[in-house]
């Protein structure tokens, strides 16, 4: 019996060693691939940027006419002038001013090209190297920085002068500083809060994501110092207590942001800075389903496998009445909480226009009997893809990690709940179906998500103990490249005239 036990222990140890080696190989492969892809992406982006500026849209495009116009005022020294049509604070224009004043001394480009360059630099240098790369080492088996650098909803705006790129860089950068603490805990938390505050100068709703970062900051320290366990309500109380006990070092930096934003609200009377009549907040609950639909679509390589689909089918079979009531509930939400903004139906320069006109809102059959089950499945994907990756806590024993910097980038039930709440708070009040609003909900969901090592089409009997994520991560990268290629082709080959615009118009996200 002793010999059998020894043999079994030896076999188990060999499997653990093999798994450990496979994980190391995956991490090394990921690093090598990301380093190799970056110069290729940089070269491709340079070509696309050249086509944007010299061929396709060598003039301010859609919202650029407002952004460029305001930046030109700053370049002329007219800092007190403001275009009342602009809805966001002036963060983008300060960056554009800085790029024009510095890079403009070295090259003879026109002002529009220089302003667009600020987003190219942000999207292909700052975003992958200074924001995603540090997070990658906390969850190296989950995502590739190169892949999130070509996330389609974000990539489209690398070549235009829009607020989304730097808004994303700064608020996700706030999370990066809070997790990686590169300057020591106190200085890093303050730097994180400052990044979060600066992000609100690009998009006001980023104040909500400041709250998400604060939750992550608190939970990563509370689970160590207070000892999270399997009693979830108890963990929430521990987090609140730890926040009160460490108010000055952990909470105060973000509380300053919330206080400043409250002052802004009282002064401005609205979240929207200008053109308030066209951006009135409401209760557009269907917007959450639009968001989950996009998340499901973009994350297909992450969750798609036979067992995942079978789990959804088995759930509907085992709980048919419950599933029917859920879908009926979604239909009721579609019926009573759908907002069709006039801009959506009037602007055929956005893919959202065609999605709504041809699919989502084409007729009652598609709207209710096709889209409701799709929304139901998207909700399942959003929730179930995360479930296996959430921290598991022992009923009694504390976790072995002693420092927050040694924790992986992983959800607990608290941060997972916070992400859902923050997503609701940022997308539901918006009356406009605008895919750009889903960038941050997707990014924050994706970077915490562990990728299943299960092969795409494997049946349970074919499963092995071999660990491997490279194939899925590679497919995810190629999936994004394919989507980007299609959207660029659509943009390049579909030019049409508007009576109210002097230049040709094109189609973007």
From Swiss-Prot:
Q: What is the documented function of this protein?
A: Dol-P-Glc:Glc(2)Man(9)GlcNAc(2)-PP-Dol alpha-1,2-glucosyltransferase that operates in the biosynthetic pathway of dolichol-linked oligosaccharides, the glycan precursors employed in protein asparagine (N)-glycosylation. The assembly of dolichol-linked oligosaccharides begins on the cytosolic side of the endoplasmic reticulum membrane and finishes in its lumen. The sequential addition of sugars to dolichol pyrophosphate produces dolichol-linked oligosaccharides containing fourteen sugars, including two GlcNAcs, nine mannoses and three glucoses.
- What gene does this protein come from? ALG10
- Reactions this protein catalyses: an alpha-D-Glc-(1->3)-alpha-D-Glc-(1->3)-alpha-D-Man-(1->2)-alpha-D-Man-(1->2)-alpha-D-Man-(1->3)-[alpha-D-Man-(1->2)-alpha-D-Man-(1->3)-[alpha-D-Man-(1->2)-alpha-D-Man-(1->6)]-alpha-D-Man-(1->6)]-beta-D-Man-(1->4)-beta-D-GlcNAc-(1->4)-alpha-D-GlcNAc-diphospho-di-trans,poly-cis-dolichol + a di-trans,poly-cis-dolichyl beta-D-glucosyl phosphate = a alpha-D-Glc-(1->2)-alpha-D-Glc-(1->3)-alpha-D-Glc-(1->3)-alpha-D-Man-(1->2)-alpha-D-Man-(1->2)-alpha-D-Man-(1->3)-[alpha-D-Man-(1->2)-alpha-D-Man-(1->3)-[alpha-D-Man-(1->2)-alpha-D-Man-(1->6)]-alpha-D-Man-(1->6)]-beta-D-Man-(1->4)-beta-D-GlcNAc-(1->4)-alpha-D-GlcNAc-diphospho-di-trans,poly-cis-dolichol + a di-trans,poly-cis-dolichyl phosphate + H(+)
Membrane-crossing ranges are: 27-47, 112-132, 134-154, 165-185, 197-217, 247-267, 285-305, 317-337, 379-399, 413-433, 439-459, 473-493
Q: Keyword Transmembrane helix on this protein?
A: yes
Short name of one Pfam family for this protein? Answer: DIE2_ALG10
Major location (coarse)? endoplasmic reticulum
Q: Where in the cell is it found?
A: Endoplasmic reticulum membrane
Question: What family does the database annotate?
Answer: Belongs to the ALG10 glucosyltransferase family.
Taxonomic superkingdom: Eukaryota
Provide the residues annotated with a glycan attachment (glycosylation): 53, 268
| Protein's name according to its UniProt entry | Dol-P-Glc:Glc(2)Man(9)GlcNAc(2)-PP-Dol alpha-1,2-glucosyltransferase
The pathway it acts in is:
Protein modification; protein glycosylation
Q: Which UniProt keywords apply?
A: Endoplasmic reticulum, Glycoprotein, Glycosyltransferase, Membrane, Transferase, Transmembrane, Transmembrane helix
User: What sort of enzyme, by top EC class, is this?
Assistant: transferase
Q: Which PANTHER family match?
A: ALPHA-1,2-GLUCOSYLTRANSFERASE ALG10 (PTHR12989), DOL-P-GLC:GLC(2)MAN(9)GLCNAC(2)-PP-DOL ALPHA-1,2-GLUCOSYLTRANSFERASE-RELATED (PTHR12989:SF10)
Q: Name one GO cellular component term.
A: endoplasmic reticulum membrane
């Amino acid at each position: 019996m002793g010999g059998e036990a020894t043999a079994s222990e030896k076999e188990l140890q060999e499997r653990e060693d093999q798994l450990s080696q496979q994980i190391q190989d995956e991490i090394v492969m990921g690093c090598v691939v990301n380093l190799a892809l970056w110069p290729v992406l940089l070269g491709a982006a340079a070509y696309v940027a050249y086509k944007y500026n010299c061929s396709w849209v060598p003039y301010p495009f859609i919202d650029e006419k407002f952004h460029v116009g305001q930046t030109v005022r700053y370049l002329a020294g007219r800092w007190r002038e403001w275009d009342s049509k602009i809805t966001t604070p002036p963060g983008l224009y300060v960056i554009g001013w800085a790029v024009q004043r510095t890079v403009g001394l070295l090259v003879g480009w026109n002002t529009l090209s220089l302003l667009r360059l600020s987003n190219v630099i942000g999207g292909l240098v700052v975003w992958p190297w200074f924001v995603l790369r540090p997070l990658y080492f906390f969850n190296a088996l989950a995502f590739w920085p190169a892949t999130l650098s070509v996330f389609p909803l974000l990539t489209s705006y690398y070549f235009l002068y829009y607020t989304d790129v730097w808004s994303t860089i700064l608020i996700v950068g706030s999370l990066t500083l809070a997790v990686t603490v590169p300057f020591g805990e106190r200085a890093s938390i303050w730097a994180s809060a400052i990044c979060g505050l600066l992000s609100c100068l690009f998009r006001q709703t980023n104040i909500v994501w400041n709250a998400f970062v604060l939750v992550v900051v608190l939970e990563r320290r509370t689970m160590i110092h207070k000892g999270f366990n399997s009693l979830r309500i108890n963990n929430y109380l521990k987090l609140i207590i730890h926040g009160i006990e460490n108010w000055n070092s952990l909470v105060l930096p973000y509380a300053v942001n919330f206080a400043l934003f409250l002052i802004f609200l009282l002064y401005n009377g609205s979240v929207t800075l200008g053109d308030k009549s066209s951006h009135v907040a409401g209760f557009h609950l269907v917007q959450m389903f639009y968001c989950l639909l996009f998340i499901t679509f973009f994350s297909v390589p992450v969750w798609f496998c036979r067992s995942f689909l079978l789990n959804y089918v088995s759930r509907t079979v085992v709980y048919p009445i419950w599933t029917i009531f859920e879908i009926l509930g979604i239909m009721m939400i579609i019926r009573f909480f759908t907002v069709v903004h006039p801009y959506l139906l009037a602007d055929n320069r956005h893919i959202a226009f065609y999605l709504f006109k041809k699919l989502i809102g084409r007729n009652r059959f598609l709207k209710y009997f096709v889209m409701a089950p799709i929304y139901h499945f998207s909700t399942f994907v959003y929730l179930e893809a995360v479930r296996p990756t959430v921290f598991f806590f022992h009923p009694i024993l504390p976790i072995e990690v002693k420092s927050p910097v040694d924790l992986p980038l992983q959800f607990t039930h608290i941060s997972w709940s916070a992400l859902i709440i923050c997503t609701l708070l940022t997308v539901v009040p918006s009356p406009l179906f605008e895919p750009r609003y889903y960038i941050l909900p997707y990014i924050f969901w994706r970077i915490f998500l562990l990728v299943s090592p299960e092969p795409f089409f494997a049946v349970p009997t074919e499963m092995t103990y071999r660990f491997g994520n490279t194939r899925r991560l590679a497919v995810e990268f190629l999936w994004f490249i394919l989507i980007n290629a299609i959207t660029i082709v659509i943009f390049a080959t579909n030019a049409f005239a508007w009576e109210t615009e002097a230049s040709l118009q094109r189609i973007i996200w």
